[in-house]
């Protein structure tokens, strides 16, 4: 299910068309929002965008992994990872879109 990748430029263009800011102001706005999200995540804060998703940093403890080639046990050091959790609103929107596409692809049943 490959699709188009939405870039910062695409977001800025959308802001330009829908909000009416200049292209430069739109690009600056997109950059500012992304910077604020990144800065909050780096500070260890949870970023919750209602009806979209939650971003947060989670600590992972040290654990033992296994080299798939040799089967040798390898220690995996503790680290922090960023998680993205889609909201239920976004999940439902994705599901509805998927079901609508699936319904369009279904061939019509001929009358018997």
Curated annotation (Swiss-Prot):
**Do the record's keywords include Transcription regulation?**
yes
**Biological process, per Gene Ontology:** DNA recombination; positive regulation of metabolic process; regulation of DNA-templated transcription; regulation of translation
Pfam families per UniProt: Bac_DNA_binding
The protein's UniProt keywords, in alphabetical order, are: DNA recombination, DNA-binding, Transcription, Transcription regulation, Translation regulation
PROSITE patterns attached to this UniProt entry: HISTONE_LIKE (PS00045)
Query: What family name appears in the similarity comment?
Result: Belongs to the bacterial histone-like protein family.
Protein name, UniProt field: Integration host factor subunit alpha
Q: Which source organism does the UniProt entry give? A: Allorhizobium ampelinum (strain ATCC BAA-846 / DSM 112012 / S4) (Agrobacterium vitis (strain S4))
Q: Which gene encodes it?
A: ihfA
